[in-house]
Amino acid sequence: MILTVTLNPAIDVSYPLDELKCDTVNRVVDVTKTPGGKGLNVSRVLNDFGETVKATGCIGGESGDFIINHLPDSILSRFYKISGDTRTCIAILHEGNQTEILEKGPLLSVDEIDGFTHHFKYLLNDVDVVTLSGSLPAGMPDDYYQKLIGIANLNGKKTVLDCSGNALEAVLKGDSKPTVIKPNLEELSQLLGKEMTKDFDALKEVLQDKLFDGIEWIIVSLGADGVFAKHKDTFYNVDIPKIKIVSAVGSGDSTVAGIASGLANDEDDRALLTKANVLGMLNAQEKTTGHVNMANYDKLYQSIKIKEV
């Protein structure tokens, strides 16, 4: 079983407009509301793929109830209730662009943070892999993911971390390391304080930096150009085919789902990387975020090319 952690979930609201007009009224006909947050996207893709998945995080108010009520029944909801209201994130789709308005979310008390920590420990009993995705809610210290990873490690669980900024830096500088991190080039550049490109020699050099010591897998997303990955002392370039992209939103989360599934099933390097990239591409071919059409899985699987570099 795979446990997904979304500490700062949201209701994602989508407003499609032919044109966004500023300083006036914009009327929307087709409004879409879905449970949002990176970890919930991971949950839905794992569910589509047929994995047994348990979802947790901090939710509150009517928005929190909406999330529980609108997840597929086959996803085991094990959320922790807090006093604050779960946030709303708005995406305005206009003229081929996407403008986002993101609420910060609720402020958690010390007691609520401690309560979730105990809740997390309890949930580990029957899981093999834990995914930790997205931003931390207000009130949680930057090193909170580090704390959860330490607990998971003590219980022999594999962890996949997908976050950025101070939370990621705190994990890299801490003692407890995740099994996998999945930065993109922009996040990698931010971590290292220099601009990174798709130069494989440069990537090989920086991924051997002491900053990444103790992390078994580093999987760097190159967007439409695939992935550059390091597993222990082996480096891989994953080349993906060109596809028609409907929406790339959530494709990184779908890739995390594939990584987690690969770990849970003890797959070899090539199988794990192939599965992860296929799920990312399948999501990009869908209008709905965090959804994959498995009818196209086998064809895309055969089109992935992986080589050691």
From Swiss-Prot:
GO molecular function, one term: phosphofructokinase activity
Enzymatic reactions: D-tagatofuranose 6-phosphate + ATP = D-tagatofuranose 1,6-bisphosphate + ADP + H(+)
Taxonomic superkingdom: Bacteria
GO cellular component, one term: cytosol
Enzyme Commission number(s) from the entry: 2.7.1.144
Pfam family, one: PfkB
InterPro entries (UniProt xref): Carboh/pur_kinase_PfkB_CS (IPR002173), LacC (IPR005926), PfkB_dom (IPR011611), Ribokinase-like (IPR029056), Tagatose/fructose_Pkinase (IPR017583)
Pathway linked to the protein: Carbohydrate metabolism; D-tagatose 6-phosphate degradation; D-glyceraldehyde 3-phosphate and glycerone phosphate from D-tagatose 6-phosphate: step 1/2
Swiss-Prot/TrEMBL keywords: ATP-binding, Kinase, Lactose metabolism, Nucleotide-binding, Transferase
Listed HAMAP family: LacC (MF_01557)
Family: Belongs to the carbohydrate kinase PfkB family. LacC subfamily.
Protein name stated in the entry: Tagatose-6-phosphate kinase
Species name: Streptococcus pyogenes serotype M49 (strain NZ131)
Taxonomic lineage: Bacteria, Bacillati, Bacillota, Bacilli, Lactobacillales
